[in-house]
Amino acid sequence: MADSKMKLHCGFIWGNSAALFCINEKGLDFELVFVDWLAGEAKTKTFLSTLNPFGEVPVLEDGDLKLFEPKAITRYLAEQYKDVGTNLLPDDPKKRAIMSMWMEVDSNQFLPIASTLIKELIINPYQGLATDDTAVQENKEKLSEVLNIYETRLGESPYLAGESFSLADLHHLAPIDYLLNTDEEELKNLIYSRPNVAAWVEKMKMRPAWLKTVVMKNHIVDLMKQRRLPIKLDSSCHESTVVAQKNAIAIENK
């Protein structure tokens, strides 16, 4: 198997899942390089000087290009490989503008709420830190208000930018998936009690590219917990070949 020029440095946070999801929608071969973000591996001098001076993941390397920030990575992949795999960018300028608008909504309205809940309910417990119950309750209430707006929008079209799945939808699923995997039934009810939102989430969760992403994400979690290889894939990722060496995983999408 030839070495892939494309590398994705990633770890256990939702922006990494969005980048993985996008690559899998495109069906691109790449090397996944595990970075234990929670253990500070993104803060080393080498990482800061060669990959991302802000010490965050994901980071994409494609030839001589290095990109950080999830939306910059997915936008590049969607444009550079527009004719490969799933088209994630509407061709119509107005629809593309609507897509961009909902990506901004994600950044400014949805993600700050979701990230706080993920931090309090998943990351803090993993690190042995206390959960701020007040912050959790406040952000559940904020999430309910935001999801009411999404429910209205998704009653007008099956996806945020219109009739087709796009980057706007892609970026929402990763944090939603984290929220659905907490022990908070109230969070699940906030999503599934809204029929349009629920249908949107379930359609995205059944996409083959997302099913691959979940398997990869689970193995990132295994790496984080166990820090040992080799990794053995289960049958749900049968369309991808994974070869692991140290913290690097070469992915061939077929």
Curated annotation (Swiss-Prot):
Indicate yes or no for the key word Transferase: yes
**What superkingdom heads the lineage?**
Eukaryota
> Where would you find this protein in the cell?
Cytoplasm, Cytosol
Any GO CC annotation of this UniProt entry: cytoplasm
Q: Give the InterPro entries listed for this entry.
A: Glutathione-S-Trfase_C-like (IPR010987), Glutathione-S-Trfase_C_sf (IPR036282), Glutathione_S-Trfase (IPR040079), Glutathione_S-Trfase_N (IPR004045), GST_C (IPR004046), GST_Phi_C (IPR034347), Thioredoxin-like_sf (IPR036249)
**Pfam families from the xrefs?**
GST_C, GST_N
In short, the EC number is: 2.5.1.18
Say if the entry is tagged with keyword Amino-acid biosynthesis.
no
Where is it chiefly localized?
cytoplasm
- All copies of the GST N-terminal domain together span 4-85
Q: What class of enzyme is it?
A: transferase
Q: What does this protein do?
A: May be involved in the conjugation of reduced glutathione to a wide number of exogenous and endogenous hydrophobic electrophiles and have a detoxification role against certain herbicides.
Q: Which family is annotated?
A: Belongs to the GST superfamily. Phi family.
- UniProt name for this protein: Glutathione S-transferase F14
